[in-house]
C-alpha cells in the first residue's frame, strides 16, 4: 500500500472532528483479544465481538487462509495494549455492524499521556494497514496519516513483509 500526499496530523484523536458528531459513546471492559483487529468486550453486561474500524491486520485465525506475515505480532501487540479487564472508551460510527455481525468500534485507551485511539496506534506501529469502508470514516485522516508514517519509517509489516 502506497499512501502519497499525506503528512502526520497532530490533531488530537481523542476529540472527534467537528463535522462528525458522536451519536454513541460508551465504556466497555476488555475480555479477550481474538487477533490483531478483533476483540471481545463486555458492554452493558453482555459480551460483544468487536472489529476495530478502519484497520486490517494480517490474518492469524481465518478458516481458509494461512497465517500471514506479521499476523502473530499484530495480535501480540494488541494484547499488550488491551489487557483483560481494562476499561476502554468506545465509539460507534455510522454503520454499527459488519457482515459477520461484529460490532464496529473505535477503541480508546487511557494512558499517562492522555487518551489513545487504539485503531490508529496499531497502524502507526506498523501492525496494520488502513481499511476504510464507507460510511465508517470518522478517523480516516488520522489513520491514513499513521499508515503513511509507519510506511515511511519502515515499521512492522512495512519492514518485514512483502
Regions of interest found by a model, annotated:
Residues 1-3:
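Hydrophobic core
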Residues 5-162:
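Small beta-barrel nucleic-acid-binding modules, primarily SNase/OB-fold domains
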